[in-house]
Structure formats: C-alpha cells, structure tokens
Amino acid sequence: NLLADGPGVVVMDRAALEAVNAVDPMITLATVPPYQQMGESGMVATIKIISYALPESTVEAACAAAGEGALRLAPPVLRDATLIITDVPGGAGDKGRAAVEGRLTALNVTLCDVVTVPHRSAPLAEAIAAAETDLVLILTASATSDINDVAPSALRAAGGEVTRFGMPVDPGNLLFLGQLGTRAVIGLPGCARSPALNGA
C-alpha cells in the first residue's frame, strides 16, 4: 500500500497508471480518485501481484511504465486562514465555523481569525481588506448567486478580483475564487456549513 506522508491532494498521470495496469493482468494498481484530499497515512494506492510472483522483467516493465511522478501528493501551500461570516437577523450565524475549521485542520492550515459582519458589501469589504492571512474564506448569510452579489462585490471593493465564479460541483456550485494581492480568497457555498463531503 502507498500511504500519504502528510496531508494533501492526490495528483496523478492517468495514462501512466493505466500503462502500469496494461503490462500484465497479474499486476494491479488501484488508486483513490484524482484530486482526492488525503490525511497523513491515508491509503493513496494499493499494488497487488495477484499471482504472488512474476518474472522480474514483468515487474521492471510495470515500474518503467509508471515512470517518475505518475502518482504524487500535492501538499498544502497556504499556512493560515481568516473566516469571514456575514450575518442577517435570524440567520445561521457561525453555524459553519466548526465544519470549515475541520477542513482547514485536516490540511494543516491554521484558522487564525473568525470575523462576523453584517451581510452588506461595505463591512465585508473592510473585513476582507483587514485580513492578513494567506487565505480568506467568506461564508455568506445567503447564497452567492450572482457575480455582483454581496461577497464578489465586496472583494472588488477591497481591491481584489474574482477569478472564477461558480464551480461544476454539486453541492457547492455557488462557490467563487478570487485574489487580493498575494492572498487567495474563496467565497464558500452554503453547503460548507455541513461537515458532509461537498464542493467546499
């Protein structure tokens, strides 16, 4: 078994891995899906010799087919994060904090600050501009369903830019990505409040 040596995301050369499996039906290489998030010691892949023994030349051919870097773990590059929550009267409040913090902790990213502001562009823009961490996460009181909604507008007002609006995942398609200087900004979808697997 190939185990993760730390947290990260699995990156693979699918053609190389398929070539390994094509060498001989007695050699099987099974992996987690591409871009699977892994924790330390999580099983990334398993290699089996079904017949228990094979000629050395067959094993060497499988190794050659894999080449270098066919399967690797991309470690987190961000160290710390700020979570900004927008709120409305009777809203969810900080209900998603624990789920977001759990995801960050699994990647060895420290949640340094949690800020709650009214669900309006101006106070949100101030909070975004004041954040000093590598990553700024925005969890809004209502779904960000338009490029000119509260959170994307606030990011632009703070001097940042929206680099991607919407994601082809479900749940989680109301996510947006942005940048403010060197800081990455992610507008989280409402499903981020749940600890269940989703696009967040």
Label the predicted regions.
Residues 1-76:
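Extended, charged alpha/beta regions that create polyanion-binding interfaces
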Residues 8-13, 46-53, 78, 103-106, ...:
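Generic detector of short, locally flexible boundary/turn motifs and exposed helical patches
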Residues 9-10, 52-53, 90-91, 193-195:
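Short, acidic Gly/Pro/Ser/Thr-rich loop/turn segments
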Residues 33-39, 78, 95, 99, ...:
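Conserved active-site and cofactor/substrate-binding residues in soluble primary-metabolism enzymes
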Residues 42-48, 104, 108, 132, ...:
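Structural signal for hydrophobic packing residues in well-ordered secondary-structure cores
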Residues 51-136:
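Phosphate-binding glycine-rich loops and their immediate beta-loop-alpha structural context
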Residues 88, 95, 112-200:
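Short glycine/threonine-rich loop/turn motifs
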